[in-house]
Amino acid sequence: MRDHCRVRVLMVLCCLMAAGVTVRAGMAQDKPEIRKDGDAKTLNAAPPGDSITEGSVTVGGQAIAYQAVAGTLTVGSTDVQDAMIGLDGKYLADAGIDLPAKPEDQPAITRMFYTAYFKKGANSADRPITFLYNGGPGSATMFLHMGAFGPKRIVTPDGQHQVAAPYPLVDNQYCLLDASDLVFIDAPGTGFSRVLGKDAGKAFWGTDQDAHAFDRFIRRFLTKYNRWNSAKFIFGESYGTTRSAVLSRMIEGVDLNGVVLLSQILNFDDSADGPEGNPGTDQPYFLALPSMAATAWYHHKVPNQPAQLEPFLQEVEQFSLGDYASALLQGADLPQDRKKAIAEKLESYTGLPAAYWIKADLRVSGGDFSKELQAEEGLTTGRLDTRYEGPDIDPLSKEAEYDPFTNSITAAYVTAINEYAREDLHYGENQTYKPSARQPGFHWDLAHVPPGGQGWESSVNVMPDLALAMKRNPKMKVMLMGGYFDVGTLFFGATYEMKHLPMPESLQSNISYHWFHTGHMVYVNEESLKELHEYTSAFIRENAGTH
């Protein structure tokens, strides 16, 4: 069973992989306060220098002058090694390190790329700071940076495939600098981040290794920029929410003010990706049904189509946790007449024929659904955003072979970050920006030591991590957001996870929820981006603790 769990989690991880006034480039006149360490010894190749530029963005009618710093921080693979590395990316002179001659034999490090935006003229003690990252695992943070909260954003057609270049890169009136200074972080091996040294991938590519790297990065950043006394927030999307749960528990000496989770997955046993590989676990099926029903509603596949989505979903959710879950839990003991009645109800919610549901034993995965919903039209329905659709690749396959949404928007974001980083931030000369760390030799270590350290988990479930962080820091607030049209990270599954966190009921009041009529990346729809900005900026202001 453990092998089945690991295979299934690998499938889920593979599926998850998937700026008002123009920034004025130029050397800034008032650099942010930066600490510097003393003499040091070079660690591997010297890291690229920081690039400091300045600009202005208009949000809510107010011009915000800012300074942008694009650079890297060097992080060690263990706490002991990390403590020997200075802020300049070199070993401290008194560390007594004798490095092997060959870089590939030297201790593993990662140089984590970041872009930080600081509001000019603001008192850092009164200015919150938010650390943002996408997921994957192994994905760069170009999506949140160029699609949601940076000073520039890429515009892609909502619900349809983006045409080829040139792509419109516009001033972002929804930039989050109105509420907080921002730090966009590329995970080890992604973007301009690099992993170097002996067994570097093994040292940083894994559930716990990754969280440790972000922990060390954030503490280094707080030291370098003298921001230890600022209100602190983390914002993770997709697998970034998994990272945030572990990070919020793991980070040393930091009480976070708030955690924002966008398109959440904390327990991979709840995923609709490949649940057939974990028989006996029926949660993915009844947690996915509301997302499937929402998708069918969007594509007008629901018999007797309801006029409004939310009341329809409330009915589906009640059925999911009631009759549907009960039927699944009976397994082979479910009477045939009862199975037929459940299948007919499922047809009324999803448009998939009752006969199909019966053939599937009432259990349809996300990939099955994406393939079947519009099969008669020769179309595959999107996974991360089910409003999108594309031509079938293999009409005879059981599951969707690709995600039309991911295919629709990725090229635009890769283009945007490359142009913006090189032309506006003046960073990345002679370097390749890696949208993903996935390459020959990439392997993600699924092992996770849960709170208490009672052995290693074979499947990823970080609900205990977030619960422990909230118990240790009962003033920390959590905001959960997501889209209805997403079968990759289920909105109903995210709520289910939150309602089942192992913590006192009183702490449930620290969690707030917001859902959008979009998919995984809610910000591809401008109206949803506007709401996303409003919710996030309000959350930061309410929990920053500044006066």
Question: Regions from the language model: what does each represent?
Answer:
Residues 517-528:
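Catalytic histidine-centered segment of alpha/beta-hydrolase-like enzymes
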Residues 247, 476, 490-500:
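Short alpha-helix in the alpha/beta-hydrolase fold that links the catalytic acid
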Residues 30-39, 80-203, 499:
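N-terminal cap/lid subdomain of alpha/beta-hydrolase-fold enzymes
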Residues 331-488:
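Alpha/beta-hydrolase fold catalytic core
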Residues 176-180, 187, 204-223:
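Alpha/beta-hydrolase active-site loop
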Residues 151-155, 248-349:
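A catalytic-pocket lid/entrance helix-loop region that shapes and gates access to the active site
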Residues 226-238:
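Alpha/beta-hydrolase fold nucleophile elbow
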Residues 235-248:
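Glycine-rich nucleophile elbow surrounding the catalytic serine of serine-hydrolase chemistry
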